[in-house]
């Protein structure tokens, strides 16, 4: 602790020598907007990360990149997984897309499944809320995370981009190359990282105390936490992928095609499914061995998740008259996805496989009618998920006992048809946005014959939902620099295949999940008020929101240890977000500074707290440029989270400090050298949104070096 305090004091004294760039949002075009408007002219709340913002987080999961944004958090499951959480919810309420189309992975089906978006190829990421989000489908009720792949951008400049990097925390290496020549582009990216190093014991003190209390006087269950830097077993990860793209046609009509292939292999800490209290192998998070002098032990097995994905994306854009419309765009995405999970249980190996084929089609017509910019779209999605019965074998992976059990999910097929209209109008200092969307969603599971009479699966045939979503936003420009407005959205969401059909043990996460085919559609009435102000070299955004849910779907633990049911209850989430950015002139130098604060509260109708609601967080950044150097400092302070759900432990707050400096040698045009330190003070960081928060903290101090050459 003394070292942390000394470093923090030093940073406070020298703060003005470092920086964090303020985002010039008024100069950034919102690509997710159908009409490509500036962020200041879009009523829907939008957060934007540019290529410069993304560059420092290429190696991390998507959630880690977004975590610094107001109202956005990450639900991590080890260093390879970070699912985005928007205003307290994620999963099937937040649609993660690439260029407005489905990615085709299975990250939403479980917290341990990673997202496959390639950040190396991504030139901009947008978090979109409000009316414009309805453009993107029935599972975008809370928001959309939309990444834009530079391969699909027909205007990407010609040239080559080469990246090499190293991170000392996990002996991580990354390499990447992107080249665009004429109308064709090609890229490849690889990452290899060993186990992460954490600043202290894997178990949180609160979890350890509860486990010790439950264990009682059983001496075999006693073990001490080791407070010191140690390696976290079962946190390795590898990633390799390549992409090729081409553009054909002219400025009026253009066909763009892109093919990508990726392979990801990562380990996650695993708790044995029959674990109840400390059994001598409870340190499945891989730290703090009981009888070894090493910093870690590997007595407990991990879950090895390997996935492969191939995606084909085609886009036809016509910038000319099509009947009464001014332009037309059609997108097609076809994805083949495979994932294998291998888990070391005490009595052998458990292996589960997932295969998913998905097809996504969207056609959009844009035009102007009575001074209203209007977009009319049609959408079709078909997802065929095959989840074969998992195998139980010996330690060598052989299925020597011939035992097969039903998998976590049955084979399922889901189909969605959508029709949507989005319109906006600007006049007399008023901005208006309106959207309406109709969806027909059908989901069907192929249950085993012997289960047809099971009470859990007494529904025959497909489950269908008819959804109507409406959103309206209105804003007033009080002057050229002040915008006040709000939006109201009525949304409906169909339960997912997991929430409906799950019926078994998900070995990778060590719990049994039971779906309910009788679940109703989830509905929400969302309201938001905001103010945006710009003056001189400063700008401020404040948003207040409330989401009132009917039949909110969530997991609830049963009386049987390790078994969870998907249930429904009314719920409410509300909070606020603040973002302030300014330019300062200090010591004859221009500084960019930013402040942010966000808070969200989630409650069930009976007054109980919703689980995994992120804690309040405060962010601060300051930075400057001089000669060929850019330097920056980012500080994030997260409060304690004591408003916990049933059986959920409180999470201590933390303060994380990141610093970085980049240098562009004048003699080597196109070369950028970057040095950064993440978690400078080696803070114990536990995200309340993470299912592993009480088993594994975030990585400790990480010194990173990268070199990037563009020519």
Model regions and ranges:
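Extracytoplasmic beta-strand/coil segments of soluble accessory domains associated
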Residues: 63-105
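Outer-membrane beta-barrel signature, preferentially recognizing the C-terminal barrel domain
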Residues: 168, 294-315, 354, 412-414, ...
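N-terminal periplasmic "start-of-domain" segments of outer-membrane beta-barrel proteins
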Residues: 27-55, 83
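Gram-negative outer-membrane beta-barrel transporters
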Residues: 426-432, 537-549, 553, 558, ...
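Flexible loop and strand-edge segments within Gram-negative outer membrane beta-barrel domains
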Residues: 233, 251-327, 335-358, 389-412, ...
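Periplasmic-side early beta-strands and strand-to-turn transitions of outer-membrane beta-barrels
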Residues: 146, 155-156, 163, 180-306
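Short acidic/polar hinge/loop motifs at secondary-structure boundaries
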Residues: 102-129
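Surface-exposed extracellular loop regions of Gram-negative outer-membrane beta-barrel proteins
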Residues: 272, 336-338, 395-398, 442-458, ...
